[in-house]
UniProtKB/Swiss-Prot annotation:
A Pfam family this chain is assigned to: RNA_pol_A_CTD
Highest taxon of the lineage: Eukaryota
Record-stated family: Belongs to the RNA polymerase alpha chain family.
Xref: Gene3D superfamilies: 5' to 3' exonuclease, C-terminal subdomain, DNA-directed RNA polymerase, insert domain, RNA polymerase, RBP11-like subunit
Name of the protein in its database record: DNA-directed RNA polymerase subunit alpha
Coiled coil (UniProt feature): none
Record organism: Populus trichocarpa (Western balsam poplar)
Any Gene Ontology CC annotation: DNA-directed RNA polymerase complex
InterPro entries from the UniProt entry: DNA-dir_RNA_pol_insert, DNA-dir_RNA_pol_RpoA/D/Rpb3, DNA-dir_RpoA, RBP11-like, RNAP_asu_C, RNApol_insert_sf
EC number: 2.7.7.6
Record region (Alpha N-terminal domain (alpha-NTD)): 1-233
Positions of region (Alpha C-terminal domain (alpha-CTD)): 267-339
Domain remark from Swiss-Prot or TrEMBL: The N-terminal domain is essential for RNAP assembly and basal transcription, whereas the C-terminal domain is involved in interaction with transcriptional regulators and with upstream promoter elements.
Amino acid sequence: MVREKVRISTRTLQWKCVESRADSKRLYYGRFILSPLMKGQADTIGIAMRRALLGEIEGTCITRAKSKKIPHEFSTITGIQESIHEILMNLKEIVLRSNLYGTHDASICVKGPGCVTAQDIILPPSVEIIDNTQHIASLREPIDLHIGLEIERNRGYCMKPPKNFQDGSYSIDAVFMPVRNANHSVHSYGNGNEKQEILFLEIWTNGSLTPKEALHEASRNLIDLFIPFLHAEEENFHLEKNQHKITLPLFAFHDRLAKLRKNQKEIALKSIFIDQLELAPKIYNCLKRSNIHTLWDLLKNSQEDLMKIEHFRIEDVKHIFGILKIEKHFTINLPKNKF
């Protein structure tokens, strides 16, 4: 049987923007690459990034309109070309950029005739309109239009209850999604066991964020989601004394990792799962039951630790050492002592 050799790439991951353009004030496009990645990693990152880009990034929207002169949403006002429903839909499309939190007030106060556009909205100082030309309404007669607005910052899609309030305010379904679309694709290169991958990310935004800003924010949000796992408390296992236990030298694998460059190789070791080591089924199952899933998990255990695993024998430890004798591919100094 030919054993597949597992190699670790010590090359630092790098990303860059390979294409960037603004098709309009409300449509930005960016294309990015990340490489080199091990087989399977590009899809893992690409799927997570796409979900984070579309669902985890916050946006600012108009969520409510208020006017005492409006009897109901589907009514019309003399002198205004659009129905109230059409005006609400136009307000829904207004693209805003801000760092505010909570609910803030804005307003429209215009005298006709003329066109009402986004530039006629009176906003808080911290809010910016991306496209001042966005149409809201057309006033055909010399009438006064006064609309109170509420602005919120949130994420995802927020469907307001259909109920209208007695004060003449109307809720607006808000799409707090600065990223219009995101796609990823994978390019493989290399031969045989040396295959690596390049991740391509395409991002379209509504102009309130650039694709690069969206990529940074999505990355930070993903990191924040995983940080709790890094601070999880280790469980303390109290093992009963066993008179038949074999006493082994207190050699800890992690003592041999002192020469590694932690920022690169530690991450690489955590990316190699014990599934790739072609272990015997019994050994594999024992390790998995002991929450040893990666090469990094394995190397943190001493020989004595491994012998404490239920149903584990000295021959099993030797078998693991036999597999890890491909040490030159891990650049790790393994023990030379015999059992």
